[in-house]
């Protein structure tokens, strides 16, 4: 099929534009003009479309005059920041061969640094004619420009002053997952005009709460510009979480209270001043263009066959390892460049401290499957800038062989859903969890202890943005997603939750007390385990989503954090702060080497000893007992050989967990004469003001469903 053309064109004097350069890609101002460069291996012509400042009126179309190494490029002298533009790309419309060029569709520059306006759903957005008997093989000639966000040339200048990366060591890292809108929309100290924006997140009172909590790094859900799905808007909902990116360099316009890119940089500077890192959740596995029936917004119309993974036997259709309709092809060098350029932009220009990669297995896929030696994964480790920031993988996707927990290369940390599921099942009271629970408490060495990887490679979590909040985890057996208007069919049914006896809110004081204790148990397990803990914003004071375990579309009070704390919330917050302080005070809780049970002959101790309630080491039979629910974890910091002496590094700690519903007498290990056990944490007694001192060889009554942390201390008398 021959290339189709745009229905309307404008002739422009060719002398206006110069040849420019093929690099860097995107629209870049050099102080005298703007250079435009766009990759397309299969296009026949590219038109640059200029708009007024509102983006509503197309003023001019200019053909990019040069084509060098698959890059269309041109230079507009006297152009300056604030210029609003888009592209129309000509080429064959042959879906069966993977080509979907349609110059009637205005396209977003994949390298755009800022967008103007928002997407307005219309049939004109689609490259084919909706309702046509040929479906997506038909060709639509309507102009999509009135309905598409436009790109804006920016001036990147910003005075950072003395800002620099906080560079918190992994061993001291505690992640805090939050949503830009959700965290500030209901915060009383945030001005109304700043709520739900980067300026709101930079609020001093909000940052004080985060800093006082004891976390080190804020992990923001996606902030790249994204599209609200049409079916959600029709229901009065929207794509709240933002896992539907359309521009990898541009922040979502709604998050800019000022409308200026500098607002993001100002937020980063405020976070760094507070000693906090910023980690971005990034979605490079797919785009908002969907499958073959989706709209033509950007990459599909620029070079569909290069950007996306297509079915090898019928390139009309997309490989869908993301579960969203399409999958980006990072085996293509220019797609790989797009993603790594985006990462370098956010890390370098915007001073971001790290990234969490959504469905990261996709980013390591060749056509034959996942490889930890994929060019993208290797590039991140070798890049002189990216190797300095934190890299966190969500190590799975929806494709064959997509579950890759523990299989990412050294240099990467990974979300560990094995920790989540095992810890939930253990405190729920499921049988046969004890041995697996012990493995998760030691940073899942069975998964990560290889090739010099460290315990912090395991990112431990009990809850995350997708799923129940911590309060809902102990309050609901089943999901309650009716507000999503999908007949409660969305969201997982495998929650491993326990409502403690009643579904949802109750006035029963016994059940409410048990729920509070269970939340303390979860927090104690998370923050006293080896590895890197992640807390979800609001869990620290018992936030609820009323049983909704899939609030992806709830830009409402369901998805926003309520900062009006009740007494239970305030008490839980104080308890969590105490745990984070203890974690930082005792390096043995955040070791740089795995606990493996090795015996140190020089000092006569093991790095970890697993104790049964009778005080003896766990036997094989006890490990295999499906009814076992009580365990002691004796950690001796002296057994870790490290060239650096750190305060508290040689401490000896005893962690006892009891998931039985009844009290279990536990024989505490004997101690040298003059020493004693000091109880630092007891989830059954959260208001314990002073450490409880326990005498030699004490038989301690460990209450049902509780966690104890004890430290070995010398009597000062």
Protein language model regions, located:
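Conserved, mostly hydrophobic/aromatic
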Residues: 38, 87, 178, 220, ...
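Carbohydrate-interacting/catalytic domains
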Residues: 1-176, 181, 198, 210, ...
């Amino acid at each position: 099929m021959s290339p189709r053309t745009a229905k309307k064109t404008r002739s422009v004097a060719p002398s206006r534009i110069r040849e420019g350069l093929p690099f860097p890609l995107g629209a870049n101002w050099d102080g005298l003009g703007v250079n435009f460069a766009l990759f397309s291996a299969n296009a026949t012509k590219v038109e640059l479309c200029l708009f007024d400042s509102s983006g509503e009126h197309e003023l001019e179309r200019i053909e990019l005059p040069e084509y060098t190494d698959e890059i269309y490029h041109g230079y507009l002298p006297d152009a300056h920041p604030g210029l609003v533009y888009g592209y129309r790309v000509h080429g064959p419309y042959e879906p069966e061969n993977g080509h979907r060029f349609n110059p009637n569709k205005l396209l977003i520059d994949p390298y755009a640094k800022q967008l103007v306006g928002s997407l307005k759903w219309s049939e004109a957005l689609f490259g084919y004619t909706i309702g046509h008997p040929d479906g997506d093989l038909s060709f639509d000639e309507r102009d999509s420009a009135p309905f598409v966000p436009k790109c804006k040339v920016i001036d990147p200048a910003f005075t950072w002053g003395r800002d620099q990366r906080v560079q918190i060591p992994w061993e001291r890292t505690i992640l805090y997952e939050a949503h830009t809108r959700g965290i500030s929309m209901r915060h009383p100290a945030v001005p109304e005009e700043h709520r739900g924006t980067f300026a709101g997140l930079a609020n001093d009172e909000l940052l004080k709460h985060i800093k006082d909590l004891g976390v080190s790094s804020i992990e923001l859900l996606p902030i790249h510009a994204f599209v609200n799905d049409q079916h959600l808007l029709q229901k009065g909902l929207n794509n709240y979480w933002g896992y539907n990116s359309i521009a990898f360099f541009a922040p979502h316009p709604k998050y800019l209270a000022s409308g200026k890119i500098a607002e993001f940089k100002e937020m980063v500077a405020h976070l760094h001043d507070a000693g906090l890192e910023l980690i971005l959740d990034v979605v490079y596995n797919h785009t908002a263009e969907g499958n073959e029936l989706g709209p033509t917004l950007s990459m599909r119309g620029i070079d569909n066959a290069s950007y996306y993974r297509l079915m090898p036997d019928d390139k009309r259709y997309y490989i869908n390892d993301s579960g969203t309709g399409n999958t980006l092809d990072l085996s293509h060098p220019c797609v790989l460049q797009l993603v790594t350029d985006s990462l370098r932009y956010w890390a370098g220009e915007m001073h971001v401290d790290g990234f969490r990669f959504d469905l990261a297995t996709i980013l390591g896929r060749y056509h034959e499957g996942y490889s930890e030696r994929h060019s993208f994964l290797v590039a991140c480790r070798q890049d002189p800038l990216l190797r300095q920031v934190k890299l966190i993988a969500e190590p799975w996707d929806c494709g064959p062989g997509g579950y890759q927990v523990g299989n990412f290369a050294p240099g990467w940390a990974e979300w560990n859903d094995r920790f989540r599921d095992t810890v939930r099942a253990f405190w729920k009271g499921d049988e046969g969890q004890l041995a697996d629970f012990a493995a998760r408490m030691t940073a899942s060495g069975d998964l990560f202890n290889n090739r010099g990887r460290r315990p912090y490679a395991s990112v431990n979590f009990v809850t995350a943005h997708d799923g129940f909040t911590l309060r809902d985890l102990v309050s609901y057996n089943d999901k309650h997603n009716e507000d999503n208007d999908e007949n409660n069919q969305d969201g997982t049914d495998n929650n491993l939750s326990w409502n403690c006896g009643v579904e949802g809110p109750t006035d029963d004081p016994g059940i409410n007390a048990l729920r509070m204790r269970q939340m303390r148990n979860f927090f104690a397990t998370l923050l006293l385990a080896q590895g890197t803990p992640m807390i979800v914003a609001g869990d620290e004071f018992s936030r609820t989503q009323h049983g909704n375990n899939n609030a992806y579309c709830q830009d409402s009070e369901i998805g926003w954090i309520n900062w009006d704390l009740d007494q239970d919330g305030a008490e839980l917050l104080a308890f969590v702060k105490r745990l984070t302080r203890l974690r930082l005070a005792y390096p043995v809780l955040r070791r740089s080497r795995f606990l493996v049970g090795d015996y140190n002959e020089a000092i006569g101790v093991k790095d970890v000893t697993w104790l049964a309630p009778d005080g003896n080491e766990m036997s094989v039979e006890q490990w295999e007992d499906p009814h076992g629910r009580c365990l002691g974890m004796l950690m001796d910091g002296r057994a870790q050989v490290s060239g650096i002496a750190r305060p508290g590094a040689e401490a000896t700690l005893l962690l006892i967990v009891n998931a039985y519903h009844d009290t279990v007498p536990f024989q505490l290990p004997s101690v040298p004469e003059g020493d004693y056990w000091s109880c630092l944490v007891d989830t059954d007694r959260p208001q314990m003001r002073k450490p409880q001192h326990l005498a030699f060889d004490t038989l301690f009554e460990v209450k049902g469903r509780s966690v104890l942390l004890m430290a070995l201390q010398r009597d000062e008398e």
